[in-house]
Amino acid sequence: MKDRIVQAVLFLLATVILLPCLLLLVWMFTERWAWPALLPQRFSLRAAAEVFGRRGELLKVFFSSVLISTAVAALSAVIGVMTCRALVFYDFFGKRLMGFLTILPFMVPATVFAMGIQLTFIRMGLNNTISGVILAHLICSLPYGVRLIMDGTKALGKELEDQARVLGASPWQAFYKVSLPVLAPVILSAASMAYVVSFSQYFLTLMIGGGQVRTFSIVMVPYLQSGDRSMASVYSVLFLAVTLSVFGLYEWIGRKWTKDSEGGFYE
């Protein structure tokens, strides 16, 4: 009985996840689908042909989005590891304040944050640049990385590194050979979360990038706002495909890194 309930819940969750994806695929080739009709009244290849007909622009948007999100994910992982080790293993003045600052971006609405940081970035010359967008995304994504890596760092502790030091390892060797392989699943999960947060940012990218830095979100959202569901669906499917591909790459890296042939780093 318990197994049947679990299977029913899993089936329901799969339906909730897959049904919107199926509707996106249908809307890619739909020109008119008015309520209350159950099926589209008119099919068309207009949206798909228009998007894929601009391959040059599409590739630029693709590389820009992946570059920004990958940079944010990598920086979030590196800074997250260093921050968590400092907060967990060391005592210093202002430790509690630093811990509070790591979650502060959670408390500030994105609109308020974007408006405030835009003025600062204009003075620093970082507006309308990819580096400025990466830095802004990093501030929003870093708390996710810190929170995820913090739990893993606390659970692991420093005892194994201390034993490696006793056996003659340097501080870097003790971390790289002992702690890092164990923390790899947590670090990659944090990087994945940071990637998703960055990849889906619209308002912050618009404010800091000033329309000069184009990502999938910047291109897709105007079609959603204008009601052109066919065009929005094409970009949404591409958005989903790119994200799943990157997550597949992270899964492969996780398997290689941890040398675990039985499961990936999400398990």
Where are these predicted regions, by residue range?
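Faces of alpha-helical transmembrane segments in polytopic inner-membrane proteins
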Residues: V16-I17, V72, S76-I79, L101-V112, ...
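Transmembrane-helix boundary motif in ABC transporter permease subunits
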Residues: M1-R4, I68-T102, M115, L119, ...
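Membrane-interfacial helix termini and adjacent extracytoplasmic/periplasmic loops
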Residues: P36-L39, K95-R96, T111-S141, W172, ...
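Amphipathic cytosolic juxtamembrane alpha-helices at the membrane-cytosol interface
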Residues: F63, L67, F93-R96, L156-S189
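C-terminal transmembrane helix and the adjacent membrane-cytosol boundary/short C-terminal tail
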Residues: M1-A8, L13, L19, T30, ...
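Loop-to-helix entry region at the N-terminal start of transmembrane alpha-helices
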Residues: E57-S64, L119-L142, A184-A191, Y235
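Interhelical loop and adjacent transmembrane-helix boundary motif
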Residues: K2, L45-E57, S198-K256, E267
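Periplasmic/extracellular loop-to-transmembrane helix junction in inner-membrane transport proteins
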Residues: W33-V72, Q225-G227
